[in-house]
Amino acid sequence: MKASLVQLSTQPLVTEREWTEDGIPVLTASCSLPQPVKPQGAAARRVRRYYQLQRRFFFRYCEAWLLPQARAEYHAALAASRPLPCFRAELGYRVTWNQDGLWSLYTHIRETCPGGPPLLGRRGDTWDLAAGYPVPLKAFFPGVRSWKGTLLAFAAGEIARQEAAGVARYHDHWRQALRRHFNPQNYYLTEDGLAFFYPMYAIAPTVEGTPVFTLPFGTPGLRQPAAQTPQ
């Protein structure tokens, strides 16, 4: 019987594109996503295809959504004799867990548009290397029906603590927003615990970026990653 992968070896694959108007750059895009470094079985092939598809979607998004805005801003600036703007989009990633048969990471996108703050986005992925498929969040709470409530209560406690200490600021209606904007796909594993996050603007002002809460391993009901991996 062929042994399952315990870790996944990858390297960044970087791709860049530039769009011009009248020979002037109006939009640049940079994409850095993981790529398995050598044949490692079906799981590695699925990972490769998954991030190849994400790369294509990113550049299609840039061309279909950002490029028309960039061209419009360019012509408006040209007509008003203002400095010519250039939009920028960056997609990158960070591997946060790579052991015990699980590979976890988040990808992050940053859009820089003239006249406004950078827009940030994040996506979490956790892969079961034995099965070759993503692991649903609830799999880390076996037998716990109220796992969502556990996460929401933890986030609420962290927000109350941060606001009391004056280290962060959240919307006045953050308690309702926590439940409304909770997405079980927005998580990844770290050495400290299970990190789950909310989109920019969803529960906090722009200055707070992407709010992240990390439920520590050892919390009742949260399964340790090593125990998640099939033997």
What is the role of each PLM region?
Residues 1-231:
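Compositionally biased intrinsically disordered regions enriched in Thr/Gly
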